[in-house]
């Protein structure tokens, strides 16, 4: 599935981060470690080297470990600032999870328009191994981000193709989010994610996933020790659509709130 289920409980999260620059600000080191309920651990580390005003290279590592799942991600990339608005980049990724691993190469362009509107175009290709299955992947995506002092909107469209000896899948994914600060004390966020997967071997859609979510945070400026958080989520997953007798259709409503 393209959309993974999240942990919708409000848990205690501890985060420690470090950022330092060296050699007259040409080298930057950033790292962050977080743990949730002293069980779920995440580690991020990255080094950026600025060769000149236009060209930089970077490498990074990410590690996540949950109760029943872990992942490792290693990246090496470089970026060239073509002008004040356009930058080009390439990136190599090595991903490893419990039952899968991938070697992917990405090529992209970032375009900034009037400072508050940015557009990203990305193409990705590589090899993926899941269990005993090996297949190739190609993906192209377009991401638009619009930012103002009081709100932020992000929309992403992605087309992904996985093909090999045992599968020939097309997947269409859209990811959308909005955040709006109605006042210094109140913020609203919303997300909408949707994906559909088609199997060309049988010329049929085999999976659909949708997730809608709205959340809010209330932290009075005059009483900053008080916090009220809330979230409503609707999830709909349809799997194994190729066989009616074994198809699954899951619909879930989740409401969570917390005050302190």
Q: For each predicted feature, which ranges?
A:
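Gram-negative and organellar
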Residues: 1-260
């Amino acid at each position: 599935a393209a959309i993974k289920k999240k942990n919708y409980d409000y848990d205690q999260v501890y985060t420690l981060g470090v950022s330092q620059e060296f050699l007259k600000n040409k080298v930057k080191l950033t790292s962050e470690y977080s743990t949730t309920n002293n069980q779920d651990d995440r580690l991020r580390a990255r080094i950026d080297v600025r060769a000149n005003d236009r060209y930089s290279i970077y490498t990074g590592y990410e590690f996540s470990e949950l109760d029943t799942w872990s992942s490792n991600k290693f990246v090496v990339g470089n970026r060239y600032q073509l002008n004040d608005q356009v930058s080009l980049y390439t990136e190599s990724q090595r991903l490893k999870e419990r039952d899968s691993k991938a070697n992917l190469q990405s090529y992209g362009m970032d375009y900034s328009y009037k400072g508050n509107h940015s557009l990203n175009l990305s193409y990705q290709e590589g090899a993926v191994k899941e269990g005993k299955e090996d297949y190739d992947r190609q993906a192209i995506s377009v991401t638009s981000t619009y930012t103002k002092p009081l709100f932020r909107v992000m929309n992403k469209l992605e087309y992904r193709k996985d093909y090999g000896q045992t599968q020939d899948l097309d997947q269409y994914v859209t990811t959308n989010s909005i955040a709006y600060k109605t006042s210094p004390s109140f913020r609203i966020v919303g997300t909408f994610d949707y994906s559909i997967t088609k199997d060309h071997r049988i010329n049929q859609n085999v999976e659909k996933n949708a997730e809608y979510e709205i959340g809010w945070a209330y932290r009075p400026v005059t009483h900053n020790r008080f916090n009220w958080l809330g979230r409503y989520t609707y999830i709909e997953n349809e799997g194994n659509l190729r066989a009616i007798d074994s198809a699954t259709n899951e619909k879930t409503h989740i409401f969570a709130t917390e005050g302190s």
